[in-house]
Amino acid sequence: MKLQFKPVYLASIAIMAIGCTKEVTENDTSEISEVPTELRAAASSFYTPPGQNVRANKKNLVTDYGVNHNDQNDDSSKLNLAIKDLSDTGGILTLPKGKYYLTKIRMRSNVHLEIEKGTVIYPTKGLTPAKNHRIFDFASKTEEKIENASIVGKGGKFIVDLRGNSSKNQIVADVGNVTNFKISNFTIKDEKTIFASILVSFTDKAGNAWPHKGIIENIDQANAHTGYGLIQAYAADNILFNNLSCTGGVTLRLETDNLAMKTAKKGGVRDIFATKIKNTNGLTPVMFSPHFMENGKVTIDDVTAIGCAYAVRVEHGFIEIFDKGNRASADAFKNYIEGILGAGSVEVVYKRNNGRTWAARIANDFNEAAYNHSNPAVSGIKPGKFATSKVTNVKATYKGTGAKLKQAFLSYLPCSERSKVCRPGPDGFEYNGPSLGVTIDNTKRDNSLGNYNVNVSTSSVQGFPNNYVLNVKYNTPKVCNQNLGSITSCN
């Protein structure tokens, strides 16, 4: 579907109300209001398409480079050669309908891939299981910055099929040090692979070496991992996300937790716009989680959650302290930190750096005390945040099963509904159960350290039982404290 963009006159974006609100059924209508139903923007604010001279230079991967698009051999070297050949003058490279096996495809400046409708892209067979693998790389792991590059489905959507590979560590596109890019028009068939399928990445190079000015749109994904999903944005400026859909996981995860950004003291996201973000049977369509990064403004319109835990999840920024003493256990490190900051100051202890180091997350109420403490073991680390942001036209539909639930969410599900939940088995990752509500916002919304405002307006809430807590805040009382041991296994 092609976006119909309208010109804008104030900055690069305008949000306009058209039409009326839908009928709302909810036990708490205080947050329901008339909201915009479409986010309209000038396409040129995000991406400039190739000019006529570039479009006139066309090559075909099969007829010009001899790729067999019917076998199962690795086609990466020939595709990389074709991209390199076109990069000097710029051009369009067509991948005719067929099957291609690809890995480590290096995108270059002024090269635009047009992949015909119905084409299937597979990761190369026999990839090393323990390593991370990228099909397309927009200057994330390569050295040079690139400009003016795109991958789009031609005539309809192509397919990226991640299923059945020897490696579960699969990334469809890693978008790094690139300006003016577009990724559009395909379907991802997943099987809960590790990583979000599209990473909007920080690169630890000189300057602001991360994505600027781009569009990611018209992509749907099936069977995503709850801990990942379709998109994760670490660092980006002036990006539009449009018409994205995911089954499972998180569709648009604005979680800026790349540790390289913490060391470099730069990165994060600014001027992010999104519209038509949907998730079915997942965790949530939209997630804000700044970790340690100070991020800019995010504007989102038209969010749909069907059978998800929540439609919008907002997490406070936090201080994360690493165990430089390499203690033997999580409890030992927790006791050390709480000996400095006081009982209850550690929210959770977990492993970072590929399981090599204990990390303690400081509880939100202790952020100020930790930041200003005299002990250098805990002081001086500032929790992250977003600038005041907006999510409008949120639609949440209840389903009695299929939602992916974090353990911490279960306290807000009435005890009478616990029979609808099953716990992870040996191969599981998350609890499964009913939709829980519309929003969960763990920020104090007072602009103290790690806290910020995401203003959410809802246009349609359907099917939730009357005793559900639809909008959970940081101080919402828990409604069920039953032991989780009685919940039966999903497997």
Swiss-Prot record:
**Example GO molecular function:** iota-carrageenase activity
Q: Which key words tag this protein in UniProt? A: Carbohydrate metabolism, Cell wall biogenesis/degradation, Disulfide bond, Glycosidase, Hydrolase, Polysaccharide degradation, Secreted, Signal
Where does the signal peptide begin and end? 1-19
Example GO BP: cell wall organization
| Main localisation | secreted
Where does it reside? Secreted
> What InterPro entries does this protein's entry cite?
Pectin_lyas_fold, Pectin_lyase_fold/virulence
What Enzyme Commission number(s) apply to this enzyme?
3.2.1.157
Top-level division of the source organism's lineage: Bacteria
Q: Which GO terms describe its cellular component?
A: extracellular region
The main enzyme category here is: hydrolase
Q: Which reaction does it catalyse?
A: Endohydrolysis of 1,4-beta-D-linkages between D-galactose 4-sulfate and 3,6-anhydro-D-galactose-2-sulfate in iota-carrageenans
Query: What are the annotated disulfide bridges?
Result: C422-C490
Similarity comment text for this entry: Belongs to the glycosyl hydrolase 82 family.
Give the function comment from the record: Hydrolyzes iota-carrageenans, sulfated 1,3-alpha-1,4-beta galactans from red algal cell walls, with an inversion of anomeric configuration. Also active against hybrid iota-/nu-carrageenan, not active against kappa- or lambda-carrageenans.
Q: What is this protein called?
A: Iota-carrageenase
The species is: Zobellia galactanivorans (strain DSM 12802 / CCUG 47099 / CIP 106680 / NCIMB 13871 / Dsij)
For this protein's source organism, the top of the classification is:
Bacteria, Pseudomonadati, Bacteroidota, Flavobacteriia, Flavobacteriales
Q: Which gene encodes it?
A: cgiA
